[in-house]
A protein has these predicted regions:
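Phosphate-group recognition and catalysis centered on beta-loop-alpha active-site segments
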Residues: 1-181
Length: 181
């Protein structure tokens, strides 16, 4: 598994993986956050294999104009996105940052691929492990944000859904989190 950047670890909706017969045998069903998900998963590929895939618009019905870029770009790594943000900052004279979301951190920890260390290491490598860095880390889970709080000084954002609670089973529910104390 690599520090690749996709919206989900199941990549059939954001890449052309289904068009690669050499990866057909990797299609599988996994339980992610308590629900079965069928497809191809980043954790089953090497970075070199992921780099052979091409990105595509995840929600073409919502963003039809973006489909004109389908197939043009490889899957970026976190390091590549950070470099892109830094280059854009230099070119424009404006601060360009990143807003990574840790997706399914409990799942990744359960399979021996915790996300937090790799994310913080990447930020430290470029001097972005500080409170005023152009970075906000977001997650729908609670436990990994608590862990990140001990590892980094960048701002952490608790995401919430309209109903239910964090996939890591942490209390309180999202509704209770949104209630003033």
């Amino acid at each position: 598994c690599s520090s690749d950047l996709r919206h989900e670890n199941e990549i059939s909706g954001t890449t052309d993986v289904a068009n690669h017969p050499e990866f057909a045998d990797r299609k599988t069903t996994k339980t992610i956050d308590g629900a079965p998900v069928t497809g191809w998963f980043t954790e089953d590929f090497t970075l070199a294999e992921l780099k052979t895939l091409r990105a595509r618009e995840r929600l073409p019905q919502l963003r039809p104009g973006n489909t004109r870029f389908d197939g043009q770009a490889a899957i970026p790594t976190l390091d590549e996105i950070i470099a892109l943000a830094k280059a854009a900052s230099r070119e424009t004279g404006r601060t360009i940052g990143i807003y990574p979301e840790t997706k399914h951190p409990s799942y990744f920890a359960s399979i021996g691929l915790p996300l937090e260390g790799r994310l913080v290491d990447a930020l430290k490598k470029v001097g972005w492990d500080r409170a005023d860095a152009p970075v906000f880390i977001q997650s729908f889970e609670v436990a990994n944000l608590k862990k990140l709080k001990t590892m980094t000084r960048v701002p952490l954002i608790q995401l919430m859904a309209a109903s239910g609670g964090p996939a890591d089973g942490a209390e309180p529910s999202y509704a209770a989190m949104a209630t003033p104390e």
